Amino acid sequence: MPHLLVTFRDVAIDFSQEEWECLDPAQRDLYRDVMLENYSNLISLDLESSCVTKKLSPEKEIYEMESLQWENMGKRINHHLQYNGLGDNMECKGNLEGQEASQEGLYMCVKITCEEKATESHSTSSTFHRIIPTKEKLYKCKECRQGFSYLSCLIQHEENHNIEKCSEVKKHRNTFSKKPSYIQHQRIQTGEKPYECMECGKAFGRTSDLIQHQKIHTNEKPYQCNACGKAFIRGSQLTEHQRVHTGEKPYECKKCGKAFSYCSQYTLHQRIHSGEKPYECKDCGKAFILGSQLTYHQRIHSGEKPYECKECGKAFILGSHLTYHQRVHTGEKPYICKECGKAFLCASQLNEHQRIHTGEKPYECKECGKTFFRGSQLTYHLRVHSGERPYKCKECGKAFISNSNLIQHQRIHTGEKPYKCKECGKAFICGKQLSEHQRIHTGEKPFECKECGKAFIRVAYLTQHEKIHGEKHYECKECGKTFVRATQLTYHQRIHTGEKPYKCKECDKAFIYGSQLSEHQRIHRGEKPYECKQCGKAFIRGSHLTEHLRTHTGEKPYECKECGRAFSRGSELTLHQRIHTGEKPYTCVQCGKDFRCPSQLTQHTRLHN
């Protein structure tokens, strides 16, 4: 086997001053340790022979230690090496002057003397020490605790760990096409937000986010919907909004099949299945799916309402509530039902309305099995079973299931009626009452009975009507007449008792129903809010207008099954049917004579008077 000549210069690496200054302390320490170990490995082969040239057996290679140029390295090695730089003329004698064992017995300190070659007049010598590790495995890996005899082996082993880590980091970095994207991603992990809004002080991790945020202050909304004209700050918001018009719902839940327009809605929906509610209120312990829900909920405890309407001064917990409220003033209803053409203030109202057409009631009570269109309806319904009424009026102490019920109730005390009809000027406590009232003017009756086809303005009226086709549980003990509701029986019994608890302050006239008093008071005020568009005639009641309109149309929807005679009013049919049945429920107290209708009894009593 040929002899190979290896010098220390072959295995040494030199840095320029500029390169050295670029290294951090850890890299300098690593450089020092590796160079010392390389030198140790070479010198440990034969300490007593000349370091200049040593020929070994044929099985070994030949090493030569010549021209130890450590001028750069000499300034950086361990202080244990008492050395200020060997020049090109230094020759190592390789004499072992002494050995000192460390206290732990882990290292051997070898003192080596190197003498400079004679120059013109003098020679000098320099002494340094070298720490050589023993055969014990002194170097332990911090990652896996594996032991090594030599530092170089440990360094190589640790490099393997680092390569594994770096491959993961590179994988992560490769998800970003450009360096700025990686920097922005790092800011997400560190929480750094260097870009601050001068208007409100809010900080952002990206300049693009800051630019979009500043549009809130400038009210700039460059992205406009061609369908409804609504404008948005971001293009992504417009894209999501357009799905309201197209009906596109690309995000489908694999568990229940429900689809969503927005990815965020889909993510939140999945928490319904998992039951995850990571955000808990410290005041009452209530938990929420969203962090923003917790923030809004905490405003209930604090009473904070940061969003105020400039038109009427009303304040709201949520910005979205203010947006919807402002549409009450502007009359804007951008969300239109494709089935019936009805328009709504917000998308959630449209979604809930569409369930009327589909009959979908996805929220079911586990106590009684009752189903609901809205999740909030189920929440309020559950309080019927539990008896919980968390919202209490400070004026009268009355408690309510929902906060909206409390707000509406408080308007009774304040007299506030913010919802005004543009047709007749009548004002209402809540928007729902106004919507139902407007159907009187439009003639709209969206709630139809499947049994007989009769339609109603309110779903409550339809519910009451449907009970007519079913059982009548409430019977009058006086005359045997049965009723669907207990309240109907109560009002009916007042006919027998003569009780009229609702009294007019103007003329002292009394009434059985509160609604009768309200309608009567319009006589004193001269108010007739229901006007016929055909002839201009006005009426106190909406029902009177409906009956009057049949005069123009000739419609007589109430037909007698006995004789086939038809009537414009249901009350006329009821009175007519008493001719066939012979029923006379109204009795004169003075003479005992019976009559078919109250007007006949009234005329008769005048004879006695």
Curated annotation (Swiss-Prot):
Q: Name one GO biological process term.
A: regulation of transcription by RNA polymerase II
Supply the Gene3D superfamilies for this chain.
Answer: 6.10.140.140, Classic Zinc Finger
Principal subcellular localization: nucleus
> Which SUPFAM superfamilies does this one have?
beta-beta-alpha zinc fingers (SSF57667), KRAB domain (Kruppel-associated box) (SSF109640)
**Any idea where the KRAB domain is?**
6-84
> Keyword set for this entry?
DNA-binding, Metal-binding, Nucleus, Repeat, Transcription, Transcription regulation, Zinc, Zinc-finger
Gene Ontology cellular-component terms for this entry are: nucleus
Highest rank taxon of the organism: Eukaryota
Q: Where in the cell is it found?
A: Nucleus
Q: Does the keyword ATP-binding apply?
A: no
What is this protein for, i.e. what is its function? May be involved in transcriptional regulation.
Family membership: Belongs to the krueppel C2H2-type zinc-finger protein family.
Q: What is this protein called?
A: Zinc finger protein 571
Gene name of this polypeptide: ZNF571
